[in-house]
């Protein structure tokens, strides 16, 4: 019985002690809470100023002291630093600002949780400064007054048939607008270390080595210089490849690849100068067995410079690897020898005679009357080609109109045709009663030539 009473008394004592501890803790918690009615909670920061456990009534003094000691450390990309003090910019405490909102937010009964969770507040215009003094101080910053290295985009370098990426240059040029904006933000928030790089105060290259556009541009450059165009000129060839193409390429500020059209046109122009044969000197074995030196005329190869320039640009853009002939305005029948081939009309002005050969065989020959040199109407010399042929044409000129059955022009309005008004051909008629420049032929001769000739057939006109 005695043991039972002792156990009951012990349990009552334990409960009483627990109640004492609990109410003591509650009482202590309430007492501490009463303290925080007029004090800031643990880990409280306002505009960068630590006011933990500080009395509300002392806030003005705390802030004023902070401002007197305030400075902001500016760290450059290079690691160099400089300091702006609050005094230099006329920094002051705006004592007209009310802290009532913060006091209301901070529940004094939540002081325990503030031990584990910080509270940071920002009050607009808590710190004020002289904007003019700030501008003056910014203008004096070393980082704005040393030798400037401008940022530069990534670049590309041609090496052995392809392009390498040359890394961009960050430089040290500061954007004054962003610098001022960052300073105002940091000063207003009471922050004391400004890293210019982290706050993006530097001018930056638009494109870096890791930009998607950079990779795209490199691939495009490599594609362009992979082109290989081999031009055929009979037995001769001209090859255009990366060694030349890369000199025509440029990358602009937006990393767009530009092909210099003028360079391409100049290349085609040089091909034209080298391989065009219109009007060149030619040797020709005449029907009388003599060697005639021919020069002038409209016959020969002639590259279409505009068309080939455009075609070549497209080949480069597609990275083509091809063999081709250039685009031509006109072609000769051959690239070999005198290029005349074995189908042609031969006109000997001295002998006033015409021969027509087809596939190496003479089809017809006969006397003709050419232009009167004594009246300024000499028939043109050189090598030409039949432009077209027409039956029943009417030829007109100053003071004449003539109807002919067979008309085969080879130089403007100069051509070969029948002349029904003539009864004699050959000899020296052309010196007295020659044509206005055309080659007059007997009907049979004109007819046979007309029936066997094709457009583009060479016409050789020479004097012995």
Segments (PLM) and residue ranges:
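Surface-exposed, secretory/extracytoplasmic low-complexity segments enriched in Ser/Thr/Asn/Gly/Pro
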Residues: 2-402, 406, 453-455, 460-464
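Active-site scaffold segments
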Residues: 407-461
């Amino acid at each position: 019985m005695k043991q039972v009473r002792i156990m009951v008394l012990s349990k009552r004592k334990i409960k009483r002690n627990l109640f004492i501890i609990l109410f003591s803790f509650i009482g202590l918690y309430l007492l501490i809470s009463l303290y925080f009615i007029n004090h800031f909670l643990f880990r409280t920061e306002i505009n960068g100023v630590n006011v933990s456990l500080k009395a509300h009534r002392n806030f003005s003094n705390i802030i004023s002291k902070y401002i007197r000691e305030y400075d902001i450390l500016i760290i450059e990309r290079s690691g160099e630093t400089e300091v702006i003090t609050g005094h230099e910019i006329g920094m002051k405490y705006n004592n007209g600002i009310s802290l009532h909102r913060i006091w209301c937010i901070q529940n004094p009964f939540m002081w325990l949780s503030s031990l584990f969770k910080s509270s940071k507040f920002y009050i607009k215009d808590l710190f004020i400064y002289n904007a003019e003094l700030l501008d003056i101080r910014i203008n004096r910053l070393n980082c704005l007054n040393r030798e400037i290295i401008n940022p530069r985009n990534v670049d590309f370098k041609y090496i052995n048939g392809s392009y390498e990426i040359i890394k961009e240059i960050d430089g040290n040029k500061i954007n004054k607008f962003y610098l001022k904006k960052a300073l105002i933000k940091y000063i207003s928030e009471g922050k004391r270390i400004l890293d210019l790089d982290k706050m993006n105060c530097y001018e930056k290259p638009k494109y870096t080595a890791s930009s998607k556009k950079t990779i795209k541009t490199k691939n495009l450059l490599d594609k362009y210089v992979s082109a290989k165009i081999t031009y055929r000129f009979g037995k001769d060839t001209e090859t255009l490849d990366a060694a030349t193409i890369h000199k025509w390429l440029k990358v602009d500020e937006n990393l767009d690849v530009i092909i210099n059209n003028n360079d391409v046109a100049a290349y085609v122009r040089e091909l034209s100068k080298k391989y065009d044969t219109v009007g060149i000197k030619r040797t020709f074995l005449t029907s009388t067995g003599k060697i005639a030196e021919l020069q002038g005329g409209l016959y020969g190869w002639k590259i279409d410079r505009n068309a080939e320039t455009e075609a070549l640009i497209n080949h480069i853009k597609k990275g083509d690897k091809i063999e081709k002939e250039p685009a031509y305005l006109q072609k000769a029948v051959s690239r070999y020898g005198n290029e005349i081939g074995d189908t042609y009309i031969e006109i000997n002005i001295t002998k006033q005679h015409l021969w027509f050969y087809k596939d190496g065989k003479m089809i017809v020959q006969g006397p003709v009357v050419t232009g009167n040199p004594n009246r300024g109407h000499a028939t043109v010399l050189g090598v030409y080609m039949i432009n077209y042929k027409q039956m029943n044409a009417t030829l007109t000129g100053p003071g004449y109109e003539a109807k002919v059955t067979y008309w085969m022009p080879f130089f403007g309005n100069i051509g070969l045709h029948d002349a029904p008004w003539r009864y004699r051909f050959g000899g020296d008629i052309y010196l007295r009663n020659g044509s206005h420049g055309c080659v007059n032929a007997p009907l049979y001769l004109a007819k046979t030539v007309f029936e066997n000739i094709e457009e583009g057939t060479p016409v050789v006109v020479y004097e012995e």
